[in-house]
Swiss-Prot record:
<dbReference type="InterPro" id="IPR043144">
    <property type="entry name" value="Mal/L-sulf/L-lact_DH-like_ah"/>
</dbReference>
<comment type="similarity">
    <text>Belongs to the LDH2/MDH2 oxidoreductase family. DlgD subfamily.</text>
</comment>
<comment type="function">
    <text>Catalyzes the reduction of 2,3-diketo-L-gulonate in the presence of NADH, to form 3-keto-L-gulonate.</text>
</comment>
<dbReference type="GO" id="GO:0047559">
    <property type="term" value="F:3-dehydro-L-gulonate 2-dehydrogenase activity"/>
</dbReference>
<keyword id="KW-0560">Oxidoreductase</keyword>
<dbReference type="InterPro" id="IPR003767">
    <property type="entry name" value="Malate/L-lactate_DH-like"/>
</dbReference>
<feature type="binding site">
    <location>
        <begin position="168"/>
        <end position="174"/>
    </location>
    <ligand>
        <name>NAD(+)</name>
    </ligand>
</feature>
<dbReference type="Pfam" id="PF02615">
    <property type="entry name" value="Ldh_2"/>
</dbReference>
<dbReference type="GO" id="GO:0070403">
    <property type="term" value="F:NAD+ binding"/>
</dbReference>
<dbReference type="InterPro" id="IPR023689">
    <property type="entry name" value="Diketo_gul_Rdtase"/>
</dbReference>
<dbReference type="InterPro" id="IPR043143">
    <property type="entry name" value="Mal/L-sulf/L-lact_DH-like_NADP"/>
</dbReference>
<feature type="binding site">
    <location>
        <begin position="224"/>
        <end position="225"/>
    </location>
    <ligand>
        <name>NAD(+)</name>
    </ligand>
</feature>
<dbReference type="GO" id="GO:0005737">
    <property type="term" value="C:cytoplasm"/>
</dbReference>
<keyword id="KW-0520">NAD</keyword>
<keyword id="KW-0963">Cytoplasm</keyword>
<protein>
    <recommendedName>
        <fullName>2,3-diketo-L-gulonate reductase</fullName>
        <ecNumber>1.1.1.130</ecNumber>
    </recommendedName>
</protein>
<feature type="binding site">
    <location>
        <begin position="304"/>
        <end position="306"/>
    </location>
    <ligand>
        <name>NAD(+)</name>
    </ligand>
</feature>
């Protein structure tokens, strides 16, 4: 089915208001969920909203909580999220990283006791739109086996890197081949994954999203490389925030909350003039996109460039929402 941005935001807003969330907070949170969906990231927008409400109902998310600054060391700050709403707090932390970068050239905010930030790419994009390089990542509950194991002991720990090119170039990637949200998107659409995304119960690589969702044997991105990167991202986020590691979140909490996150902004224009910056970025992009195509019908793409097109399409044609997901939201 198709819905408009306004319909989607209003549906989110009403569910939040029904649960006693303050009007201003509910409006801001609903807006972020709707914008994520409008950008084409259904897995962490409309599809994720029922799960978000479940955690709100369980008390994992404290909607009235406000993040507090704990430590300030020039370009580096440490904050405690107080288990506040994840996407609103993440937006504030990237804003703060940009403020620090304006003073120091680079700003780093380490956040502990946070909730799921939904679409991590929103915060990298937020920085790139204002001319900064945006880098951020989060740890999570253990939802992926480390390389060589069958049991989940590491997080998917998504990493985002956004560059202020025209259009914005952005990598937003889980340390698994696919996020669990994308497994759900493909399962709901009745599609196999385009490449192997995990192991079946017999230990064979599989493209069946439902099998991987059930047995949790999701495949690390790049096999042992994604496994290793997940581990070191967790270590850095834990140390800089003095927060919880994947091990602590998994063993000590009843669900995925109280995670650790990193937000970095770099003010490029302190290091290079605007005309030179734009020319260098354009040369990089042109060099890549003019490569001979492996398939004449498929263009060479740069990461994140599809979001501008998806946004235009959804604004023009309406936002596609799975019927079963919409029914869940209407029932909340």
């Amino acid at each position: 089915m198709k819905v408009t941005f306004s319909q989607l935001k209003e549906a989110f807003n009403q569910v939040l208001l029904k649960r006693g969330v303050a009007a201003e907070t509910a409006d801001a949170c609903a807006d972020m969920f709707a914008r994520t969906t409008e950008s084409g990231v259904y897995s962490h927008g409309v599809n994720r909203f029922p799960r978000f409400i479940q955690q709100l109902d369980n008390g994992d998310i404290i909607p009235e909580a406000k993040p507090q600054r704990i430590t300030s060391l020039g370009a580096i700050e440490q904050w405690d999220a107080q288990r506040s709403i994840g996407n609103l707090t993440a937006k504030k932390m990237m804003d703060r990283a940009m403020e620090l970068a304006s003073d120091h050239g680079i700003g780093l905010v380490a956040l502990r006791n946070a909730n799921h930030w939904m679409r991590g790419g929103s915060y990298g994009w937020q920085a790139a739109e204002k001319g900064y390089i945006g880098i951020c990542w989060t740890n999570s509950i253990a939802v992926m086996p480390p390389w060589g194991a069958k049991e989940c002991r590491i997080g998917t720990n998504p990493l985002i890197v956004a560059i202020p090119s025209t259009p914005i170039t952005m990598v937003d990637m889980s340390m698994s081949m696919f996020s669990y949200g994308m497994l759900e998107v493909n399962r709901l659409a009745g599609r196999e994954l385009p490449v192997d995304g995990g192991f079946d119960d017999e230990g064979n690589l599989t493209k069946e999203p439902g099998v991987i969702e059930k047995n949790r044997r999701i495949l690390p991105m790049g096999y042992w490389k994604g496994s290793g990167l997940s581990i070191v991202l967790d270590m850095i986020a834990t140390l800089l925030s003095n927060g919880s590691s994947v091990a602590e979140v998994t063993q000590e909490n009843s669900d995925e909350y109280g995670v650790s996150q990193i937000f970095i902004a770099i003010e490029v224009d302190k290091l290079i003039d605007g005309a030179t910056r734009d020319a260098k970025l354009q040369r990089i992009m042109d060099f890549i996109t003019t490569a001979e195509r492996a398939d004449e019908n498929v263009a060479v793409r740069l990461p994140g460039h599809e979001f501008t097109r998806l946004l235009e399409e959804n604004r023009r044609d309406g936002i596609t929402v799975d019927d079963s997901v919409w029914a869940k939201i209407q029932a909340l």
